Amino acid sequence: DTEHNVPGGEYLSKQLKAIKCNHMHIVFGMVDDKDIQGVLDLLPQNATYYFTKANNKRAVSENVLKLYAQTKNLQGESYPDVKSAYDAAKKAADNNDFVFVGGSSYVVADLLKNCI
């Protein structure tokens, strides 16, 4: 699951906790008709975030998402598109780190279209 809603977030948070790595880098964006606060509540606080938005009219601004996330003690920077967020996460990640891309399925679609 990409964690686009609370039930998906509950499942994914268990999966992320099980991953053995030095540090987690999370490229994250959402659309405006989802429970943003509820999903953010489920994300790990010990990760670095790369807040972004998909190329979709329903996408929440990366800057607004960052502000919401800061109220949940999630720290990171904002990026105007998925490619720049993903590139920054890859550059910052070491060999024993883990990079996750999700939040909205549109974010994953942009990753597949533009980065892989």
Language-model features: where?
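Residue-level signal for inorganic ion chemistry
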Residues: 1, 49, 101-104
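Glycine/aspartate-rich loop-and-adjacent alpha/beta segment that forms the canonical ThDP
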Residues: 104-116
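Cofactor-binding loop segments of dinucleotide-utilizing enzymes, especially the Rossmann-like FAD-
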Residues: 28-32, 52-54, 103
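C-terminal helical cap/extension that packs against the catalytic core
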Residues: 40-98
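Nucleotide phosphate-binding/pyrophosphate-handling subdomain across enzymes
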Residues: 2-48
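Short glycine-/acidic-enriched loop or helix-start segments at secondary-structure transitions
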Residues: 9, 36-38, 61-62, 110-113
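Generic beta-sheet signal
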Residues: 24-26, 97-101
